[in-house]
Design a protein with these regions (language model features):
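A non-transmembrane, solvent-exposed segment enriched in polar/low-complexity residues
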Residues: 1-86
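Generic structural signal for well-ordered beta-strand positions
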Residues: 32, 43, 143-144, 253
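Domain-scale detector for complete catalytic domains at protein termini or as standalone homologs
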Residues: 64, 72-76, 80, 84-90, ...
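N-terminal "domain-start" segment that seeds a small globular fold
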Residues: 112-145, 217-219, 264-267, 271-272
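Short, internal strand/loop/helix patches
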Residues: 134-137, 205-244, 248
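Short active-site neighborhood of thiol/selenol oxidoreductases, capturing the structured segment around
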Residues: 144-166, 172, 185
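Structural microenvironment flanking redox-active thiols in thiol-disulfide oxidoreductases
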Residues: 167-214, 225-233, 267
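Thiol-/selenol-based redox modules, centered on thioredoxin-like
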Residues: 240, 245-274
Length: 274
């Protein structure tokens, strides 16, 4: 089961007729969550395992080399086995369930990392970026990538229905405000299409409505062909939001750039002298 405090989600292991209580500090949710009562050990193990994964599977790990990644995963496996040894009262059936979850997590995370690794190789820094031409501009007319030649271009690929995309909007607005007089353009490209909206006309209307209601800043573009747009296909975009940074000469800086909410993006901008 899961429970929610309005900001974070916690997991809880329950059986019929269980009596269980927990305490926590909402400012340090996982770090302070502690269970007492029936099946307290099962629940405390879940929390400890979650913290273990947070410690080893950091955002920086996804930018590491394959050797560094595999070395960290080996350390995580050792730490996981050590954690199990501290909960010796738990039965084998419970650990079998947790082991299966752990293995599934490993497979999914490794697959995600390998995908990002292949992307880094395929879209190497300094190679010429794919381009787009004549996308509809919310402010009027059409816009092409070549219009931004001479400036860095930070591209946000998003859609109106995408929850994680909308989470990044406030951070993106702050970035645009902070760097409005710098040598960089912020460009948002909507991939809204008929697959979600029913018709392209409805998708287009949804895009215009959200841009207006959310008072989205930067350059707001609509592909007109959604996920089938050449630029989206050329960059092998399979999930959103996706962020891309291109240099003033039209070359790739990062084909899978940090999100606006990540401190790593500011560091990258500073390194580039933006």
């Amino acid at each position: 089961y899961q429970f929610f405090d309005g900001n974070e989600v916690g997991r809880i292991y329950l059986k019929n007729d269980n009596t269980i209580s927990f305490t926590l500090d909402t400012k340090a949710f996982d770090e302070t969550l502690k269970f007492e009562g029936d099946n307290a050990d099962q629940n405390n193990f879940l929390i400890a395992n979650s913290l273990l994964q947070e410690r080893y599977l950091s955002e920086d790990l996804l930018d590491s080399s394959e050797a560094e990644f595999l070395k960290t995963f080996d350390k995580l496996e050792v730490a996981y086995d050590s954690l199990k040894n501290t909960y010796k009262t738990l039965n084998a059936a419970y650990f079998l369930e947790q082991d299966n979850d752990f293995i599934s997590m490993q497979k999914a995370y490794k697959a995600y990392f390998m995908g990002k690794l292949e992307m880094r190789k395929f879209f190497a820094k300094g190679t010429v970026s794919p381009t787009f031409s004549n996308y509809e501009n919310f402010s009027g007319g059409t816009t092409s990538l070549s219009d931004f030649k001479g400036k860095y271009t930070y591209i946000d690929i998003w859609a109106t229905w995408c929850g994680p995309c909308k989470v990044e909007i406030p951070y993106l607005k702050k970035l645009e405000s902070k760097y409005h007089d710098r040598n960089i353009e912020f460009v948002s490209i909507s991939v809204d299409d008929d697959r979600r909206s029913g018709t392209m006309e409805k998708a287009h209307a949804d895009w215009k409505k959200m841009v207006a209601e959310k008072e989205l800043t930067g350059v707001q573009l609509f592909t007109g062909t959604g996920w089938n747009a050449d630029f989206i296909q050329d960059y092998k975009v399979s999930g959103i939001p996706r962020f891309i940074l291109i240099d003033p000469n039209g070359n790739i800086v990062d084909a899978d750039a940090p999100r606006p909410s990540s401190k790593k993006l500011i560091t990258l901008f500073e390194e580039l002298g933006i």
